[in-house]
UniProtKB/Swiss-Prot annotation:
Its main location: membrane. The keyword Ribosomal protein does not apply. GO terms for cellular component: peptidoglycan-based cell wall; plasma membrane. One of its GO terms (biological process) is peptidoglycan biosynthetic process. Peptidoglycan polymerase that catalyzes glycan chain elongation from lipid-linked precursors. Keywords: Cell inner membrane, Cell membrane, Cell shape, Cell wall biogenesis/degradation, Glycosyltransferase, Membrane, Peptidoglycan synthesis, Transferase, Transmembrane, Transmembrane helix. This is Biosynthetic peptidoglycan transglycosylase. It catalyses: [GlcNAc-(1->4)-Mur2Ac(oyl-L-Ala-gamma-D-Glu-L-Lys-D-Ala-D-Ala)](n)-di-trans,octa-cis-undecaprenyl diphosphate + beta-D-GlcNAc-(1->4)-Mur2Ac(oyl-L-Ala-gamma-D-Glu-L-Lys-D-Ala-D-Ala)-di-trans,octa-cis-undecaprenyl diphosphate = [GlcNAc-(1->4)-Mur2Ac(oyl-L-Ala-gamma-D-Glu-L-Lys-D-Ala-D-Ala)](n+1)-di-trans,octa-cis-undecaprenyl diphosphate + di-trans,octa-cis-undecaprenyl diphosphate + H(+). Belongs to the glycosyltransferase 51 family. GO terms for molecular function: pentosyltransferase activity; peptidoglycan glycosyltransferase activity. It is an enzyme of class 2 (transferase).
Length: 224
């Protein structure tokens, strides 16, 4: 019985720890669980932090347009997009996927594991709501742009990805280059911004238009 209690306490600590840690990420340069795991295994890992204010203004706009167009309007979960994804999965008879917000991806990348299992999703939802509550939107976006996997050889964050793909800093990306990085986010190992295929180029064209649309809501100070 004592062992069961100890295990329950340990489980509670593991589950609650992210809620205690998250508010402290208002500052600093946090790393993702995948970055930490790669470092522990001795696998290649490149990340150089760049502040949101220093990035090309086209970069956050492209990523928000591509990944989470309602980022500035929801509170961590895009319930409308979630319902649509569930309805589409039911109609098509396929497994539910997609509809993850940038905040959910930050929750997953900082505190959880990769994969699509139900347990991770169940932990991710309330944690995303909490992160949205304790961190400002610009900070959530800044963290995401610095911890997302964005290259085939362990490149994490937009600065390392920009150097790898274009040989320049994320501070000086053009609209097209920013959109190319946004286009590879779902699968940066198979997709390439450095040598983009027709699918990536087509997506990039779409994201350039979306990023420049006046209807895209912004909730961060843009670096003009």
């Amino acid at each position: 019985m004592r062992i069961v209690k100890i295990l329950l306490v340990a489980l509670a600590v593991v589950v609650l720890a992210p809620y205690v840690i998250a508010p402290f990420y208002r500052t600093g340069h946090p790393v993702s669980t995948l970055m930490a795991w790669r470092s522990l295994r001795g696998a290649p890992m490149q990340r150089e932090w760049i502040d949101l204010a220093a990035m090309s203004p086209y970069l956050p706009r492209s990523v928000v347009a591509a990944e989470d167009a309602h980022f500035c309007k929801h509170h961590g979960i895009d319930w409308g997009a979630l319902r649509e994804a569930i309805d589409d999965a039911k109609e098509d008879g396929t497994a539910f996927r997609g509809a993850s917000t940038i905040t959910q991806q930050v929750a997953k990348n900082l505190f959880l594991w990769q994969g699509r299992d139900f347990i991770r999703k169940a932990l991710e939802f309330p944690l995303a709501l909490w992160i949205d509550f304790v961190l400002p939107k610009p900070r959530i976006l800044e963290i995401y742009l610095n911890i997302a996997e964005l290259g085939p050889q362990g490149q994490f964050g937009v600065e390392a990805a920009s150097a790898y793909a274009f040989g320049k800093s994320a501070a000086s990306l053009s609209p097209r280059e920013a959109a190319l990085l946004a286009s590879i986010l779902p699968n940066p190992v198979k997709r390439s911004a450095r040598t983009p295929g027709p699918g990536v180029r087509r997506l990039a064209g779409t994201y350039v238009a979306r990023a420049q649309a006046s209807t895209l809501a912004t909730c961060w100070r843009e670096n003009r």
